[in-house]
Amino acid sequence: MSEAFDCAKCNESLYGRKYIQTDSGPYCVPCYDNTFANTCAECQQLIGHDSRELFYEDRHFHEGCFRCCRCQRSLADEPFTCQDSELLCNECYCTAFSSQCSACGETVMPGSRKLEYGGQTWHEHCFLCSGCEQPLGSRSFVPDKGAHYCVPCYENKFAPRCARCSKTLTQGGVTYRDQPWHRECLVCTGCKTPLAGQQFTSRDDDPYCVACFGELFAPKCSSCKRPITGGSGGGEGAGLGGGKYVSFEDRHWHHSCFSCARCSTSLVGQGFVPDGDQVLCQGCSQAGP
């Protein structure tokens, strides 16, 4: 008598039948499938021993059931995305859920590098500076009326330009004759001393510090021969630095220098008598030589 060779579950003889050997013993094919096979998450049928089984996120599928839920394309050898537990091929996912690039109008594929700003989406290689047309990537940019500029292009296009060097002012600066200047560009035409924050004047639109303007253009005091910085014209006036002066005919004096050539009495606001290159008070003039 031959030794018994039965299925470990149904106890039916396996002689002459197909069976599957396991650690716990041999099983006929139906018992093996009922005992060990996984249930397909799509069709809810057992995945038999002779079926190709696919596994994704704790779920098991027949190869034929592993499909895009929209177009039914097999995903066995295709890239796919899971959205709300549903499997979608990349094409269907992009159509349903992906954004369109605001520049080229093409779909921004899942996993691709993209940039989002102001509710819009771009491929990384499509987000370009409106000036130089170079990719902005992670660089700083300035939005302007729907355009986007890298900082150098924005400054070159929109920033004010210095009246002296014509280069853009990116920060600070001063205003002279209603025009912007770099602080370092507003210097005395004579000695090149910076004039920002200092008192200065101009001649023929060129700025000068008080000292250079006096040396170059101001009339000289008839007494001390030093320059008088201020306005021109007869009578009394105020110099550029606030110092007062006196003019008579073609001669000029500092207030402190306008005095009688003999007795040194100040003649400011007093009557005086010219005597050649000198001026005398009335008393000294009447006293004679």
From Swiss-Prot:
The lineage of its organism: Eukaryota, Metazoa, Chordata, Craniata, Vertebrata. This is Four and a half LIM domains protein 3. It comes from the Eukaryota. A zinc finger (C4-type) spans 7-31. It comes from Mus musculus. Interacts with SOX15; the interaction recruits FHL3 to FOXK1 promoters where it acts as a transcriptional coactivator of FOXK1. The keyword Metal-binding applies. GO terms for cellular component: nucleus; stress fiber; Z disc. Expressed in myogenic progenitor cells (at protein level). Expressed in skeletal striated muscle and the heart. Expressed to a lesser extent, in lung, and kidney. Expressed in skin and skeletal muscles such as the masseter, tongue, tibialis anterior and plantar muscles. GO terms for molecular function: actin binding; zinc ion binding.
